[in-house]
């Protein structure tokens, strides 16, 4: 079975030699100004947010949150413990943050065009918040080689709606016998709205290959 993972986090490829990691876009760092507002909380929305952030001293003695398991692990590798929601993603994070946010000052580390749900939630419940944009996603200029690679896929894993959009616009050949797997309900709904069937899998399973096989 040929399984293709579109995540830009190449560390996922360690999970199995069966899974081929082929990112559909690149991550480009953006210079930023750090908003030192005596913050009480910092949120990292992605692995790329961690990898392109430079002021980790700010994480000392404050609350650190990560959107999901991969982001938490990336922070842990740097010696930083982060809290994560039971359900990865914005909805789970909002539940974890709760509604008693007055007197708290947040910085959200994210990419250009990243989700604003956590930002809006904090404002709604009286917290102060600044977005810190430290990277952007950039499409490749040509997908001809990837189109040939993906023609051999039995299953494709989408870790973001951005990757899914690029795939269906530049790579997918109609009537291909391939199954689509998504790491969250949000990504699955996006793929379904494009007119394709998809299933949500536990991306952080101990055996991701088995997880994919059971979903097909």
Language-model regions, residue ranges each:
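Signature of uroporphyrinogen-III synthase
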Residues: 1-216
């Amino acid at each position: 079975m040929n399984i293709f993972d579109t995540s830009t986090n190449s560390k996922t490829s360690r999970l199995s030699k069966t899974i081929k990691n082929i990112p559909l876009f690149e991550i480009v760092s953006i210079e930023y100004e750090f908003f030192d507002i005596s913050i009480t909380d910092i949120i990292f929305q992605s692995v790329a947010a961690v990898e392109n952030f430079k002021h980790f001293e700010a994480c000392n003695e404050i609350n650190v949150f990560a959107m999901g398991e991969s982001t938490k692990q990336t922070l842990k590798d740097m010696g930083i413990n982060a809290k994560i929601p039971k359900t990865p993603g914005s909805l789970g994070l909002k539940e974890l943050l709760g509604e008693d946010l007055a007197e708290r000052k947040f910085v959200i580390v994210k990419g250009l065009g990243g989700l604003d749900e956590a930002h809006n939630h904090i404002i709604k419940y009286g917290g102060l918040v600044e977005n810190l944009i430290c990277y952007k996603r950039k499409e490749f200029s040509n997908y001809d080689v990837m189109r040939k690679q993906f023609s051999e896929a039995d299953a494709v894993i989408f870790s973001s709606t951005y990757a899914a959009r690029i795939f269906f616009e530049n790579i997918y050949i109609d009537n291909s016998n391939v199954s689509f797997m998504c790491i969250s309900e949000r990504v699955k709904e996006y793929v379904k709205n494009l007119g394709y069937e998809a299933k949500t899998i536990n991306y952080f399973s101990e055996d991701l290959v088995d997880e994919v096989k059971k979903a097909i």
